[in-house]
Amino acid sequence: MQEQYRPDLIEAEVQQYWAENKTFKAIKDTNKPKYYCLSMFPYPSGRLHMGHVRNYTIGDVVSRYQRMNGKNVLQPMGWDAFGLPAEGAAIKNKTAPAKWTYENIDYMKNQLKILGFGFDWDREVTTCKPDYYKWEQWFFTELYKKGLVYKKTSTVNWCPNDETVLANEQVHEGCCWRCDTPVEQKEIPQWFIKITDYAEQLLGGLDHLPLWPDQVKTMQRNWIGRSEGVEITFQLANSEDNLTVYTTRPDTFFGVSYVAVAAAHPLAEKAAENNPELAQFIQECKNTKVAEAELATMEKKGMATGVYAIHPLTGEKVPVWVANFVLMHYGTGAVMAVPGHDERDAEFARKYGLPLLNVIKPINGEPLLEHELPYCEHGILFNSGEFNGLDFDAAFNAIADKLEALGKGKRQVNYRLRDWGVSRQRYWGAPIPMLTLENGEVVPAPLQDLPIELPEDVVMDGVKSPIKADPEWAKTTYNGQPALKETDTFDTFMESSWYYARYTSPKFAEAMLDADEANYWLPVDQYIGGIEHATMHLLYFRFFHKLLRDAGFVTSDEPADKLLCQGMVLADAFYYTSPTNERIWVSPTEVTLERDEKGRILKAFDKEGRELVHSGMTKMSKSKNNGIDPQEMVEKYGADTVRLFMMFASPAEMTLEWQESGVEGAKRFLGRLWNLVFEYNKHPAETTVEPTALSSAQKALRRDVHKTIAKVSDDIGRRQTFNTAIAAIMELMNKLTKAPLVEVQDRAIMAEALSAVVRMLYPITPHICFQLWKDLGNTEAIDFAPWVEADAAAMVDDEKLVVVQVNGKVRAKVTVPAEMSEDDIKQVALADSNVAKHLEGLNIVKTIYVPGKLFSFVAK
């Protein structure tokens, strides 16, 4: 064993051993309980960032721990390889997206290997390869045959100059990123999958995911947005036409003072035919793309249509307005407005001089005055005809019943969730497998024609997708007849919605999945990824699993039993202001710091000596140039040190502040562990621990060892508080470094302790532990060594600390043998000088004993 800890010598050697022995290869074994641990796969952007390192370190710790606990562990890795950034990089670097992507994959794969992650690389999937997306295309055609796929027009960002569709990321302040032309909203046909058919299952399934974070489940519930309401039909005045609205508050129905419709509503478009001003307003609304999240805060705008709707219960006319806050794709594209009892409706009504009608009063109060409106809580109806005096529930049902009896309404469950639009007018994605025949009929491509391959050797001009620009690519045949391929590609969330399942049989060529393998490994036991995916990927992931279940591939209802959402990695960010008033961000690796005695940053300077502004700890990002390159850190400190810091510096689900001083501390700790094993090996143990031969000091040290084992096992296995597990090991190490190695049993206890510490640290710092395990005389590799178990007998305390009180105040703490009787403890307490002093001149009237903890005297 070498004297110094040299990660640069150890780590590459251990990684080579793992690669040559295929240590982490997962093979189905029905004799062992399986454990599938999965971290969200990366987009191959070029380099790993610290967020990746944190995610994959957590997954690797869990995987190695479970393997030591006798599980058959699957921990795969792959690449979410399609996506818009590749197109931008290809244009910038004058290359093809495929070439750029594959080069990045090679580079990042090597980065993952030098961090020592125990992935089964034989199961690697790359989503841009035809053998992967072939089955995605096939599955889409099967969903189409089941009626779960349809095509309809939908709004996109359109650059009229380039005549191309733009992704949201390519619209900068309302203009095209390339030519600065104002962007328009355009309706084009797009493909959708009916996720709304599964809304109730997706909602109900959340109740069966006890090991998912509540925050994620709440976000999904809100995203699905189930509501119970009434769909109400208004007859239009002087017309045969109707207008349907949806409301969750039928109790406020008598407070309707106007109806608002979306700019794209047929009624609005019809009303605009002879009203140029209204037509212009509608066009303005359509060209202003608004995210749902912005609706609450944006300025409310509207215009009267000149059309009136007849209130079905009062017969009164209410005006119909076009409003920019009504979305065509939610509900019916029309809302009944009740300004007296809705904030948004009130804001609009006050702006345009529309009445605020008050029809709900507080349950225990008087009707409110107009300036106190809107009153948005549930209450008691008044000014509501026959429904006066009813509370919310009674009014909901009574008004719904009345409308249903009149044929003017029906109870309805609505969802905020929209069907999943999967068409993208981009090149770098999987082609959508639909064909258009000469007669206009659209048909799914047959299996024998799949995959419809994306040409990889292309030139990107930054304007048009190469498969849209090349009319020859689209030409094909169907049953001998000419046909055209769809030139849109799939949303890249399609690939990431089923990759977890393909890992179970990545090379299976006969079908999308090998059902035997899928049902052995699935569901995923532990899934790890960022909470930013809560309402997109994690919802599609659950949806796809139900689709796979209904197609007969899997038997489980949910894709993952347990979810851990790791926190972001933060780092200090520094900048100076340029002469043009621009912030120039400087990498923390190029900054010299002055700190106070508590380590707080006082001043920061760049290499030119410029004083910098410290903007605090923020998420590592390219925009603030505060990312720390994992590879540089591994080269400087070793992979184990980086991994240890990542797991120790913060609870897994909280943000982690990157502090190089903390990384240095992690390296010193591993150095102390190495030194302790080196010193122990000079005089190793000649015998095993003999519990009956131990002194009280030896028993105490051994007790600490086994209590630490119990805590670490619980912290890693159940609680997943990895940082507290490491803290407990560090605390034990402090005791071990001070422990004597003189007696035979001293060395026996040290042997037992070091064997335990090395195994407990192995999931976190596997390279050093692999080597130390060998240095401690073990012939088998640590990778399949059993997890260390705490000895219950060793944890029993020989002594206990009893607090002594006199009249409720602590007067002493006495250490007594664990088995000492109450009477004997009383005598020890009475013998204490401070207790005796406070009992002097008093009569003991009562004693209270809480076994092993407290002895209390009540005296007068």
Curated annotation (Swiss-Prot):
ATP binds at K622. It is found in: Cytoplasm. Pfam families: Anticodon_1, tRNA-synt_1, tRNA-synt_1_2, tRNA-synt_1g. One of its GO terms (biological process) is leucyl-tRNA aminoacylation. A motif ('HIGH' region) lies at residues 42-52. Belongs to the class-I aminoacyl-tRNA synthetase family. This is Leucine--tRNA ligase. It comes from Pasteurella multocida (strain Pm70). The lineage of its organism: Bacteria, Pseudomonadati, Pseudomonadota, Gammaproteobacteria, Pasteurellales. The gene is leuS.
